Curated annotation (Swiss-Prot):
Stored InterPro entries: DGGGP_synth, Prenyltransferase_related, UbiA_prenyltransferase, UbiA_sf
Protein name as it appears in the record: Digeranylgeranylglyceryl phosphate synthase
Organism: Halobacterium salinarum (strain ATCC 700922 / JCM 11081 / NRC-1)
Catalytic activity: sn-3-O-(geranylgeranyl)glycerol 1-phosphate + (2E,6E,10E)-geranylgeranyl diphosphate = 2,3-bis-O-(geranylgeranyl)-sn-glycerol 1-phosphate + diphosphate
Transmembrane segments: 14-34, 90-110, 144-164, 200-220, 221-241
A GO CC annotation given for this chain: plasma membrane
The protein's enzyme class: transferase
């Protein structure tokens, strides 16, 4: 029972379901979610499995840091052994690759690149100032392009991917501020460790402003109408408030920023629904 619970925790089902939803939104914005349900389903499933595998292998490599930052996670508390977590991640990655192989060539290439990124993130990039954050930001933004590419229209998710990447970079920096003590003890050179938490939070705020500036582009270029603009405003406001909140409470700030990201993504669905 405890092992099963630990495996579920390693996958982080809320995060993986959210990633799958973002892939679906990419396919939907591209106009192919209804017309190509099999491809959309395969892309969503591949995203879910790959994200779950990435979370599991991240916890495998992060197990010593988690003994300080988060001792209640599955590996530090003994619910799942390190070897078990590694094997679990391999099974999830194989499943993701099998589903991705059924998709168009560009989608397969994106999936292969993302799987490579997930495998190298914790071991090689997490401790490098900004590099790990940039990779996670790319992975977050690419879910939309992957969904769009799965139905044959990769460019349709471009602006949404840019908005997601900018805001995800900001959120990852805030999370590093939250984990500052454990990362410093583990010898990781994250951005807050190198430049200090105040400067790191200022960097995250700049990226949030960049995401806010990108949000009206679909309206300005005529892709979506004014209903999209109305729908995206709450998400932008929440993200800006989150950036400010992170200065006093990084944990609350990054959670609020995630909600703002989801609201902004939902605005693209609204834009597609009301666009002739």
């Amino acid at each position: 029972m405890e092992t099963g619970r630990g495996l579920v925790e390693l996958a982080r089902p809320v995060n993986t379901l959210a990633a799958g939803a973002l892939t679906f939104i990419g396919a939907f914005v591209a106009g192919g979610a209804v017309g190509r349900p099999a491809a959309t389903g395969a892309a969503v499933g591949a995203t879910w499995l790959a994200t779950a595998g990435g979370n599991a292998i991240n916890d495998y490599f992060d197990r010593e840091v988690d003994r300080i930052n988060d001792p209640d996670r599955a590996i530090p508390r003994g619910a799942v052994s390190p070897r078990g977590a590694l094997a679990y991640s391999v099974v999830l990655f194989v499943g993701a690759a099998a589903l991705a192989a059924t998709l168009p060539v560009l989608a397969v290439c994106i999936a292969a690149l993302n799987l490579a990124g997930l495998l190298t993130y914790t071991q090689y990039l997490k401790g490098r100032p900004g590099a790990g954050n940039a990779l996670v930001a790319y992975l977050g933004g690419s879910t939309f392009v992957f969904g769009a590419a799965a139905v044959g229209s990769p460019l349709a998710g471009g602006v949404l991917a840019a908005l997601a990447a900018l805001s995800t970079f900001a959120r990852e920096v805030i999370k590093d501020v939250e984990d500052l003590a454990g990362d410093r003890a583990a010898g990781l050179r994250t951005l807050p460790v190198v430049v200090g938490h105040q400067r790191a939070l200022a960097v995250s705020a700049v990226f949030v402003v960049g995401a806010a500036a990108a949000s009206p582009v679909p309206y300005l270029v005529g892709v979506f109408g004014w209903w999209y603009l109305v729908a995206v405003c709450p998400g932008v406001v929440v993200m800006v408030v989150a950036a400010a909140r992170s200065y006093t409470d990084p944990a609350a700030g990054q959670r609020l920023l995630k909600r703002g990201q989801l609201l902004a993504a939902a605005a693209f669905v609204v834009g597609r629904l009301v666009t002739p």
